[in-house]
C-alpha cells in the first residue's frame, strides 16, 4: 500500500478526476496498522468464490451441460490443482485470481499445459486408473486411425489385381490373338461398403498406368497419329506476314538488326550493331546536299548556312558530326572517308593562261609523288647561288651582240613566254626563237616551263624535268605539258598543207 500511494502521489491527477484527493483521505490508511484486519482480509481472499470454479457458470467458456459421471474425476483433479495453484499465488503476495482449469476435451490442452508448466508446479494428483487422460485418448485414436489406413491400403492392392484390362490391351495386335481375359471376381459386400474415395483414385491411377504401358508397346501408331510441327528457324514476323510466299515469289527480310523480333539480336559472340564498325567507311557518309531552287537563284535567295558545302573549311581533315571522337585513324586495311570534306588539291605545273594543273599524267598527284619528284631532281639545287646565264636576246634568238656572261636570274617571264607561244602557232621559226638554256641551278618550280630547246643543243646531257626521261638521241625533241596543245595544232596545220 505504501508503494502504491507513493507511486500515485507522484502521478498528477486531472482536474476532473473525482479521486484526486484520495491520497489525502485519512480513512483509507486507518486500517493500515491493524493486524487483525489484515489477517481477516487474507482469510477472505482464500475462501473466495473464484478459487473453486464451476463449469455451469456463465463466465465459463464451456457449455452449461449437466455434470457427466465420466468427466467427474477429471474435473475434481483439475479443481484440486487449481486450488493448490491459488494457494501458492496468495502465499507469494499476488492478489490475482488463479487461472481457470481447462476441460479434458480441449484439443489444445497439451500446448497450453506445456506453456504453463514453468509458471506453476502443482503437487501430484492421484488419478483414477479406469479413465484415460486426454493424451492417452489421443494416442488411442491415432493408433486406430493408422490401423484403418493400413487396412484400406491392403484392400487397394487387392483391388488393383482384380481390375479388368484396358481398352488398348484388348484392341492391340497381340491382344487380338490371345483370348479375352476372365471377368473380375465379385467381391463381398462388406468390403464394398468400406470402400472410400481413396480406392477410387487409386483405381484410376492404376488404369492409367496400364494404358501407358500398352501405349509404349505400340510406338508406330503414336508416331503416325501425332507428328511434331516443325517450326522454321530464322524467320521473323515480316517473313511470316509475307503473302508472296503463297505464290512462289517469297523474299527474306534479312539485316543486322531485327526490330520485329528482338530476341534474335542477342548474341554472345558479336552484337548486331557491330555489322557496321565504327572504323568503317559507312559511319562517315553524310546526307544529300540541299536542293537548288530556280526561284532562289533568280531572286538572289541563298541559304549558305544550311548547306554543308560552305559549312567547313578546306583545312578540316576529318569532320564526322557528333561521332568525330568515335572515328579513329586508319586501322589496318579500313580506309576512312568523310563525304562532307573536300580533299586538298595537289597543284602540278602551271600553264600560261590556264593556271595550275591538279592532274599529273591523267591521275591526281599525291603529296608522296611530288616529294619523290623533288628528291629525284634535288641535284639541281646542289650548287646553289646565282649563275651566269645567256642574255635575254640570245634566249629569244634575236642575234644581238651582247655580253653573254651577263648575270641572268631564273625568274620566268610570263609575258614573253606567252608571246613566244603565240608566235609558235603562226610561224615555223617560233620554236627556235623560244629556246632556252637549262642552267644547273634551276629550281624545281622553274623546270615546269613551256620553252623548247633548239636542235643545236641536242648533244648536251639534259633531262626532261617533268617526265624524268633522258633524251640522248639527236632527233628527239623535249616537250613539256604546256605546249602539247600547240604542237597538236601545228601538226594539224602541217597535215592540211600536205594534203
From Swiss-Prot:
A GO biological process held by the record: endocytosis
Membrane-protein topology: Peripheral membrane protein
Compositionally skewed regions (Polar residues) per UniProt: 1-65, 436-452
UniProt-annotated location(s): Cell membrane
GO cellular component, one term: cytoplasm
Keywords recorded for this protein, A-Z: Cell membrane, Endocytosis, Isopeptide bond, Membrane, Phosphoprotein, Ubl conjugation
Modified residues annotated as Phosphothreonine in this record: 47, 153, 304
Biased composition range(s): Low complexity: 85-104
Protein role: Involved in the early step of endocytosis.
Record family assignment: Belongs to the pal1 family.
Protein name: Protein PAL1
Amino acid at each position: 500500500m505504501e508503494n502504491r500511494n507513493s507511486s500515485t502521489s507522484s502521478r498528477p491527477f486531472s482536474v476532473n478526476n473525482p479521486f484526486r484527493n484520495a491520497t489525502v483521505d485519512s480513512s483509507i490508511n486507518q486500517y493500515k496498522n491493524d493486524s487483525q484486519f489484515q489477517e481477516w482480509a487474507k482469510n477472505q481472499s482464500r475462501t473466495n468464490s473464484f478459487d473453486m470454479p464451476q463449469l455451469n457458470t456463465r463466465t465459463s467458456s464451456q457449455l452449461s451441460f449437466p455434470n457427466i459421471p465420466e468427466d467427474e474425476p477429471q474435473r475434481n483433479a483439475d479443481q484440486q490443482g487449481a486450488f493448490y495453484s491459488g494457494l501458492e499465488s496468495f502465499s507469494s503476495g499476488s492478489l490475482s485470481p488463479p487461472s481457470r482449469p481447462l476441460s479434458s476435451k480441449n484439443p489444445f490442452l497439451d500446448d497450453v499445459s506445456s506453456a504453463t508448466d514453468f509458471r506453476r508446479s502443482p503437487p501430484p494428483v492421484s488419478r483414477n486408473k479406469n479413465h484415460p487422460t486426454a493424451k492417452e485418448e489421443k494416442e488411442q485414436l491415432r493408433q486406430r486411425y493408422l490401423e484403418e489406413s493400413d487396412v484400406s491400403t491392403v484392400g487397394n492392392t487387392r483391388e488393383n489385381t482384380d481390375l479388368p484390362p484396358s481398352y488398348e490391351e484388348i484392341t492391340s495386335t497381340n491382344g487380338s490373338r490371345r483370348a479375352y481375359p476372365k471377368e473380375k471376381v465379385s467381391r463381398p459386400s462388406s468390403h464394398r461398403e468400406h470402400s472410400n474415395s481413396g480406392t477410387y483414385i487409386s483405381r484410376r491411377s492404376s488404369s492409367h498406368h496400364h494404358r501407358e504401358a500398352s501405349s509404349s508397346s505400340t510406338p508406330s501408331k503414336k508416331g503416325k497419329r501425332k507428328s511434331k510441327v516443325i517450326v522454321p528457324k530464322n524467320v521473323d514476323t515480316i517473313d511470316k506476314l509475307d503473302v508472296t510466299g503463297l505464290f512462289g515469289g517469297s523474299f527474306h527480310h534479312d539485316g543486322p538488326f531485327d526490330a520485329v523480333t528482338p530476341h534474335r539480336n542477342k548474341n554472345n559472340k558479336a552484337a548486331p550493331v557491330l555489322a557496321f564498325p565504327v572504323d568503317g567507311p559507312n559511319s562517315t557518309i553524310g546526307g544529300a546536299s540541299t536542293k537548288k531552287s530556280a526561284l532562289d537563284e533568280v531572286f538572289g535567295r541563298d541559304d549558305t548556312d544550311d548547306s554543308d558545302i560552305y559549312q567547313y573549311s578546306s583545312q578540316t581533315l576529318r569532320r564526322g558530326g557528333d561521332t568525330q571522337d568515335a572515328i579513329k585513324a586508319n586501322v589496318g586495311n579500313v580506309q576512312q572517308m568523310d563525304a562532307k570534306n573536300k580533299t586538298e588539291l595537289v597543284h602540278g605545273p602551271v600553264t600560261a593562261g590556264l593556271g595550275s594543273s591538279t592532274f599529273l599524267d591523267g591521275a591526281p598527284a599525291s603529296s608522296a609523288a611530288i616529294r619523290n619528284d623533288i628528291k629525284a631532281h634535288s641535284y639541281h639545287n646542289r650548287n646553289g647561288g646565282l649563275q651566269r646565264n645567256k642574255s635575254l636576246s640570245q634566249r629569244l634568238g634575236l642575234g644581238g651582240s651582247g655580253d653573254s656572261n651577263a648575270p641572268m636570274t631564273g625568274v620566268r617571264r610570263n609575258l614573253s613566254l606567252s608571246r613566244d607561244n603565240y608566235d609558235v602557232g603562226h610561224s615555223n621559226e617560233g620554236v627556235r626563237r623560244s629556246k632556252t638554256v637549262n642552267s644547273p641551278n634551276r629550281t624545281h618550280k622553274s623546270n615546269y616551263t613551256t620553252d623548247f630547246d633548239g636542235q643545236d643543243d641536242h648533244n648536251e646531257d639534259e633531262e626532261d624535268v617533268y617526265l624524268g626521261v633522258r633524251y640522248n638521241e639527236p632527233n628527239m625533241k623535249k616537250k613539256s605539258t604546256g605546249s602539247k596543245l600547240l604542237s597538236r595544232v601545228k601538226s594539224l596545220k602541217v597535215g592540211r598543207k600536205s594534203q
